[in-house]
Amino acid sequence: MEISCSLLEIFLLSSFGIIHRTNNIGQKMQFQEFKIDNLEEFPKDLEQLLANQLETIDNITKSNDESYEGVLKPLQDLEEELGNFFTPLSHLNSVENSEATQKAYEESLPQLSKYSSTIAQNKALFEKIKKITSSNAQAQKVIDNDIRGFVLAGAELPLEQKKELEAIEMKLSELGNSFSQNLLNATNAFEMIITDEKDVAEIPESDLAQARTEIDGKTVYKFTLQIPSYLAYMTYGTSRHYRKEIAKAYASRAPENAKVIDELMELRQKKATLLDFKSFSEYSLATKDAHSTEEVTSFLEELGNKALSQAKDELEELKAFALRTDGIEDFKGFDVAYYSEKLKKEKFDFDDSMTKPYFEQAKVLRGMLDVVSELFAVEFKAVEAMVWNEKVKTFDIYKAGELAGRVYFDLEARKEKRGGAWMHDWETHFVDANGEKHLPSAFIVCNFSPSTDKNPSLLRHDDVVTLFHEMGHGIHHLFGKCDERSVSGINGVAWDVIEFPSQFLETFAYEKPILKRFAFHHESNEPMSDELLDKIKDTKNYQAALGILRQVEFSLFDFNLHKKLYQGEEVQALLNEIRETTALLPVPEYNKFQNGFAHIFAGGYSAGYYSYKWAEVLSADAFYACIDENGFNQEKAEGYQKYILNRGGSEDMSELYQQWLGREPKVESLLKLYGIEV
């Protein structure tokens, strides 16, 4: 999913809204038709389009018109025009990948990057936007976001400092790549060969088949630090010796990344200082919903403290189980996953294979749409539309009898589709410079087991949760009602709350009354038993407090590390200090977790890892507001739609939440959701 935060940032994105157009017989179409006329010529056509847009931007910049309507309205229309051309390619390259789509996509990206850089360096446009004000709150939010985007790109810096910032950005990118490459090299360099069958006796056949190989004509089992292989042995590996060996290798990967971290931290601090922030954590919050570094730290510490007591109980139960079953008296970190899985099986006797026959894809999809319809008083009608694969399903959305949006579902795996699941926004609800209203559309993409002529697509419960999650992103965009494109739908929504609506909707996928709507055996049509339904929720909350404490540890380390400049051994000392309140087992000295923390050193989560739990508190609190003893609380659900979904990025999420419920979200709601007693 792509997230737009400002005019400057949106030109970088690969997903944009699409303008309305006429079809071949001159009849107005409500939605863009999915097609690409000529893949081979696409990059050349894009080059011409971008040149035309830059000429238009130059004309806007040089004009005497300094009104919002004369400057920012047409600039947002250009975003639509660009998306009108580019979205079909970016989407097609992900869902029907081929040499032709990849070639066109790769040739297009440098053009978009250059285009974005040109806009970022347009000092005259920046000065013009700074003079604009509006009495319309949505329009003023667009203005504020755009000014912020220019400032954070260094538009107000003197020339020499601007060059320094550009050099820092380039070096940061190089260091992030180095961190990733070092980690990849270290991951690929390790192999653990097991020759004795008894040491792999408990590993599921599907995992064992991946590990099985031959050396000198003898069958052996090779495990690596690739996540599926690593987790397979840590979770099911019988031998403590081998669990320790692979755990030590994983925790001590890429020691050369320690120097990379020092360089990254130094440059991030320099970048923050150049842009007049005290720290990189403070810089990070400039585009987020959290208001201060103190607020984030207090939130994390409160969450950790409230989960601590139950986490200790969960660990003691685990240690007692290991002692009872295998006589383990010196319980270690490399024992946790193995005994957690064994205890889970003893307590619940449950796995996904028991529920999969009850989750037929078509019934799950229809059931989910019914839930959304009932919650938000909308209607989904299946329609015929041009699509990229015959298994894609398309629905138009109606609100109070009026057409309000369109959603495409591409749910089954195929070799041409990249892995994972995502929501890709397409058209956006807004009013253009000519006063015409545009309707939103979006793609929901998953990789569920394919259906055949004889057998339907059956989902694991995790798949059901994934579908609800991505639909939560979808309705955040599709239910947007703002007139200003840059803050409508998911556009302009802060990074630390973008997962709020998705996590909100996925919560319903664990509720027995919801699952009963569509959990029927695909052959006998028998409903899923109450026993199985209860186990789905019970296993979700298994060792939840330990999980929360672990996430708090990661988040506190990330955020505090970016509060000031830490170098060398100071980094490990900070992590050790945080672990005094979050790590319930001693951590061996060889553990250098930070050297593999790619989320913050090679990804987009630097000083932002807290976002996962920040958004989850909102989603849990909203969930409990929207249900009551009779099922859905329609009044609260209507308010959620009005204040949270309809208003998109037009106001800070904390303000919208206050307007909806008249209070701040409660951390206790998240703890309640995970069955953690306070």
Where are these predicted regions, by residue range?
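Short His/Asp/Glu-rich catalytic/ion-coordination signatures at enzyme active sites or charged loops
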Residues: 30-41, 89-108, 132-167, 224-258, ...
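C-terminal, non-catalytic "cap/extension" segments appended to globular domains
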Residues: 29-39, 44, 48, 62, ...
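Active-site-proximal, well-structured secondary-structure segments within enzyme catalytic domains
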Residues: 138, 142-143, 171-174, 181, ...
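Short pre-active-site segment immediately N-terminal to the catalytic Zn-binding motif
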Residues: 451-467
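N-terminal helix-rich structural modules
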Residues: 26-202, 626
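Short, positively charged and aromatic/hydrophobic N-terminal segments
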Residues: 14-25
